[in-house]
Amino acid sequence: MSVKQKSALQDLVDFAKWHVWTRVRPSSRARLAYELFADDHEATTEGAYINLGYWKPGCAGLEEANQELANQLAEAAGISEGDEVLDVGFGLGAQDFFWLETRKPARIVGVDLTPSHVRIASERAERENVQDRLQFKEGSATDLPFGAETFDRVTSLESALHYEPRTDFFKGAFEVLKPGGVLAIGDIIPLDLREPGSDGPPKLAPQRSGSLSGGIPVENWVPRETYAKQLREAGFVDVEVKSVRDNVMEPWLDYWLRKLQDESFKKSVSRLFYSQVKRSLTSDSGMKGELPALDFVIASARKPGA
């Protein structure tokens, strides 16, 4: 098959993928997008992260930013030597390999709905001969397949926004944590757009169809105060929901706008994927337009006891 024929066939396949994606309900789009465009997502990532990253001054690139985001979450969770850790919605599992090396937990179990994520992460664990301490399974964040009081820490890095609903995940995490265990989440929520010091209810931007916010179940579209309240209602104490958006949102967008100018990146992904990423990042109707209304938080909460 010629390169031209192969390109035409790939475009046809990609169009079919996009046709399917646009016709599922918004809350299912995130999972389907990760599965349909798995090869493209692998090509866009450095170090197999699928995250926005935490960008400190002088940060050299996306992998460094993503490792720092993983480090921030591990700090919030208090992951330490000997811990049993559950990572929910693990993506390609990059943070789990990072934590295994830097935090020395006894074991990390990852749960994700996307079969390709489970396969890719499991194959890497086998290649690196750590499958006894790092295990990846298919499963639902809102129906965790584990017994009560199994884990010391539960984490979710930039995936809980898609859980339907996220409050069921809070309840499940509380159940599987040991007394004294900690839940830590890196999450995207709407920003309260009120002027500082203003009274009254939070002012939230409306969700947009076909964008990041359009893929968030409506019941998850809550500000920080409500997020913290929902954690307390699930039984947690010592709840903290901290905004880190200044180190996440705009630096990530700046990185990707530069990436779009890189010819080697353009050649590494399908034309449809490139065009959709470009449209999202440069259009006011996409990520560029909605980032000012979104917050990125790191939340932590402890189960009473111990």
UniProtKB/Swiss-Prot annotation:
Catalytic activity: erythromycin C + S-adenosyl-L-methionine = erythromycin A + S-adenosyl-L-homocysteine + H(+); erythromycin D + S-adenosyl-L-methionine = erythromycin B + S-adenosyl-L-homocysteine + H(+)
Chain residues that bind S-adenosyl-L-methionine: L157, H162
Keywords: Antibiotic biosynthesis, Methyltransferase, S-adenosyl-L-methionine, Transferase
Pathway annotation from the record: Antibiotic biosynthesis; erythromycin biosynthesis
Gene3D superfamilies, per database record: Vaccinia Virus protein VP39 (3.40.50.150)
Phenotype of null mutants: Cells accumulate erythromycin C and its precursor erythromycin D, with little or no production of erythromycin A or erythromycin B.
Signal peptide: none
Enzyme class label: transferase
InterPro entries reported for this sequence: Erg6_SMT_methyltransf (IPR050447), Methyltransf_25 (IPR041698), SAM-dependent_MTases_sf (IPR029063)
GO molecular function, one term: S-adenosylmethionine-dependent methyltransferase activity
A single GO BP: antibiotic biosynthetic process
Enzyme nomenclature, EC number: 2.1.1.254
Function: S-adenosyl-L-methionine-dependent O-methyltransferase that catalyzes the last step in the erythromycin biosynthesis pathway. Methylates the position 3 of the mycarosyl moiety of erythromycin C, forming the most active form of the antibiotic, erythromycin A. Can also methylate the precursor erythromycin D, forming erythromycin B.
Family: Belongs to the methyltransferase superfamily.
Name the record gives this protein: Erythromycin 3''-O-methyltransferase
Organism of derivation: Saccharopolyspora erythraea (strain ATCC 11635 / DSM 40517 / JCM 4748 / NBRC 13426 / NCIMB 8594 / NRRL 2338)
